[in-house]
């Protein structure tokens, strides 16, 4: 792992399980850290709301802040119509954020560095918003493919472009998140490996540089969860507005 910065993204089997319809369903390091991420969110929420005090403590205040934060994002993008979809957006944000931050721990595994995970999450968002769109607007939901004011001669090309862009949403959403996680962790690993090989880890400037890189990657982890959530709300706004 010290020589190969991409080794940290390799999936390893922890518990081998019988195949299901010819497919491997082994319990891997990805499965483990995904479970850790989910349990972390559940514990954060349960411990935060267990007392329900009028004057909240630090943990309850944190839970309330996250909830208010998600509510404000939904309202600013979809209006009051989108508030009933808080469970989806809240789950997307907390799960993505938890996976990103857990991946920053030493000897951990970054679940969101794998496109298959981010694509599955993106497909949930894509499918949900599409169903909501047809449920709210019926066949009129297809009007998002043809903006108002487009000349009739340009309409077929515009419909094709908009349809392609719409179907590409889960792909772009998933690749954006995974690519940022891979890039950040790889840079940290490469720089840290170089510094250690040069025996500079105990000198002040390289040590502080590594700390700064880690701090920046934590910021990126939070930012990417935020961007993923914002885009989810934007897609939701097409369905409910």
Curated annotation (Swiss-Prot):
<feature type="transmembrane region" description="Helical">
    <location>
        <begin position="144"/>
        <end position="164"/>
    </location>
</feature>
<keyword id="KW-0406">Ion transport</keyword>
<dbReference type="InterPro" id="IPR023011">
    <property type="entry name" value="ATP_synth_F0_asu_AS"/>
</dbReference>
<keyword id="KW-0813">Transport</keyword>
<keyword id="KW-0472">Membrane</keyword>
<feature type="transmembrane region" description="Helical">
    <location>
        <begin position="29"/>
        <end position="49"/>
    </location>
</feature>
<keyword id="KW-0375">Hydrogen ion transport</keyword>
<feature type="transmembrane region" description="Helical">
    <location>
        <begin position="221"/>
        <end position="241"/>
    </location>
</feature>
<comment type="subunit">
    <text>F-type ATPases have 2 components, CF(1) - the catalytic core - and CF(0) - the membrane proton channel. CF(1) has five subunits: alpha(3), beta(3), gamma(1), delta(1), epsilon(1). CF(0) has three main subunits: a(1), b(2) and c(9-12). The alpha and beta chains form an alternating ring which encloses part of the gamma chain. CF(1) is attached to CF(0) by a central stalk formed by the gamma and epsilon chains, while a peripheral stalk is formed by the delta and b chains.</text>
</comment>
<feature type="transmembrane region" description="Helical">
    <location>
        <begin position="86"/>
        <end position="106"/>
    </location>
</feature>
<keyword id="KW-0066">ATP synthesis</keyword>
<keyword id="KW-1003">Cell membrane</keyword>
<feature type="transmembrane region" description="Helical">
    <location>
        <begin position="200"/>
        <end position="220"/>
    </location>
</feature>
<dbReference type="InterPro" id="IPR045083">
    <property type="entry name" value="ATP_synth_F0_asu_bact/mt"/>
</dbReference>
<comment type="function">
    <text>Key component of the proton channel; it plays a direct role in the translocation of protons across the membrane.</text>
</comment>
<feature type="transmembrane region" description="Helical">
    <location>
        <begin position="114"/>
        <end position="134"/>
    </location>
</feature>
<protein>
    <recommendedName>
        <fullName>ATP synthase subunit a</fullName>
    </recommendedName>
</protein>
<comment type="similarity">
    <text>Belongs to the ATPase A chain family.</text>
</comment>
<dbReference type="Pfam" id="PF00119">
    <property type="entry name" value="ATP-synt_A"/>
</dbReference>
<dbReference type="InterPro" id="IPR035908">
    <property type="entry name" value="F0_ATP_A_sf"/>
</dbReference>
<keyword id="KW-0138">CF(0)</keyword>
<dbReference type="GO" id="GO:0045259">
    <property type="term" value="C:proton-transporting ATP synthase complex"/>
</dbReference>
<dbReference type="GO" id="GO:0005886">
    <property type="term" value="C:plasma membrane"/>
</dbReference>
<keyword id="KW-1133">Transmembrane helix</keyword>
<keyword id="KW-0812">Transmembrane</keyword>
<feature type="transmembrane region" description="Helical">
    <location>
        <begin position="177"/>
        <end position="197"/>
    </location>
</feature>
<dbReference type="InterPro" id="IPR000568">
    <property type="entry name" value="ATP_synth_F0_asu"/>
</dbReference>
<dbReference type="GO" id="GO:0046933">
    <property type="term" value="F:proton-transporting ATP synthase activity, rotational mechanism"/>
</dbReference>
